[in-house]
Amino acid sequence: MQSLITYIALVFSLFVSSAIGLHLEVPALPNPQPVCIRDFVQENQMVVVNIKTDGSKGDGQRLDLKVTDSLGNEYRNKKDVVGHANVAFTSQHNAAIDICLTNYLDNKWSKHQQTVRSVELDIESGAAARDWNALQASEKLKPVEVELKRIESITEEIVEELRYLKAREERMRDTNESTNSRVKWFSIVVIASLVGFGVWQIQYLRHYFKVKHII
């Protein structure tokens, strides 16, 4: 039974909960450009970013971490990340989040060979970001009960995701219908204008020819 529940939870996790593991080499430059990772999260969804870097303070590099979303909200801005760092926040909107790393090179090191920071980045969101071991310990739950709660959490996220997709589809459909209606009426106006202009031109030419006694 427990193995079945675990299997179901893993299947659900493929659809909703996301856990991204990346290895990055971030070059250090005097005027660096940020290296960003983008992921989409739902509103009120918990996100945990785990960072592990090499290097040390005073090695001529300063690695900064900044987390924002596509709507301009800033969640975290951490300076001089060294070793292990953990950032957790709750998203405010259904939006894409950008996790950006910027590696600054100290001026006195600028004449040396190019240096980089090796970064291991883990991004977890939704049910994958929750500490289920802590929940099990605090509520004294059995492993099966923890898996059931995890499945319940994942199921709720699936429902919210489907609601969001449905609402988005309805908005896009309304936009398409409105656009089609405007194009239809614009086409009718253009055709009516062309017909009216053609009739006026025919009448004008008939009058012109009559004046000139051509017809």
From Swiss-Prot:
It is a single-pass type I membrane protein. Residues 206-215 are cytoplasmic. Residues 34-125 form the GOLD domain. It is found in: Endoplasmic reticulum membrane; Golgi apparatus membrane. Residues 22-184 are lumenal. GO terms for biological process: endoplasmic reticulum to Golgi vesicle-mediated transport; Golgi organization; intracellular protein transport. Belongs to the EMP24/GP25L family. It comes from the Eukaryota. Residues 1-21 form the signal peptide. This is Endoplasmic reticulum vesicle protein 25. Its main location: endoplasmic reticulum. InterPro entries: Emp24-like, GOLD_dom.
